[in-house]
C-alpha cells in the first residue's frame, strides 16, 4: 500500500490542527483523518463516527502497527511541509476536496 496523495486542510482549534485526506495507490480515498496535538506531540486520529452511547468507533483504520506508523510518518511530514509553506507565504490555496 502506498499513500499517493495527501491533502491537508488546517483548522484553528486548540488541539485539532488539521483534517487530512489521503489517497492509497491512486484508487482509494480516506477522508477526515485528523492531526491532533496531544500531551506528547502530534498524532493522527482515524476517521470515526459517534455512536448512540457517546463513544466513537473508527470508520477506517490500519490493521497493524507498521501501517499505522507509515501513515503517521507520511501525513505528519506533509502537514509540516504545509505549515512551512504557509509561513513562507508560498502556499497556494488547497484544491477543493471533490474526490
UniProtKB/Swiss-Prot annotation:
InterPro entries recorded: SpoVG (IPR007170), SpoVG_sf (IPR036751)
Alphabetical keyword list: Cell cycle, Cell division, Septation
Q: Which GO terms describe its biological process?
A: division septum assembly; sporulation resulting in formation of a cellular spore
Q: Does the keyword Cell cycle apply?
A: yes
Query: Which Pfam families does UniProt cross-reference here?
Result: SpoVG
Instruction: Name the protein family.
Output: Belongs to the SpoVG family.
Which function does this protein serve? Could be involved in septation.
Q: Which PANTHER family match?
A: SEPTATION PROTEIN SPOVG-RELATED
Fetch the NCBIfam families from UniProt: PRK13259.1
Q: Supply the name of the protein.
A: Putative septation protein SpoVG
Q: Which gene encodes it?
A: spoVG
Amino acid at each position: 500500500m502506498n499513500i499517493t496523495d495527501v491533502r491537508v486542510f488546517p483548522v484553528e482549534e486548540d488541539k485539532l490542527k488539521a483534517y487530512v485526506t489521503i489517497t492509497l495507490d491512486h484508487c482509494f480515498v480516506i477522508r477526515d483523518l485528523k492531526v491532533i496535538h496531544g500531551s506528547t506531540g502530534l498524532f493522527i486520529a482515524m476517521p470515526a463516527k459517534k455512536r448512540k452511547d457517546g463513544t466513537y468507533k473508527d470508520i477506517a483504520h490500519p490493521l497493524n502497527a507498521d501501517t499505522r506508523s507509515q501513515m503517521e510518518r507520511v501525513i505528519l511530514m506533509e502537514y509540516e511541509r504545509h505549515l512551512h509553506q504557509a509561513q513562507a507565504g508560498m502556499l497556494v490555496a488547497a484544491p477543493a476536496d471533490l474526490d
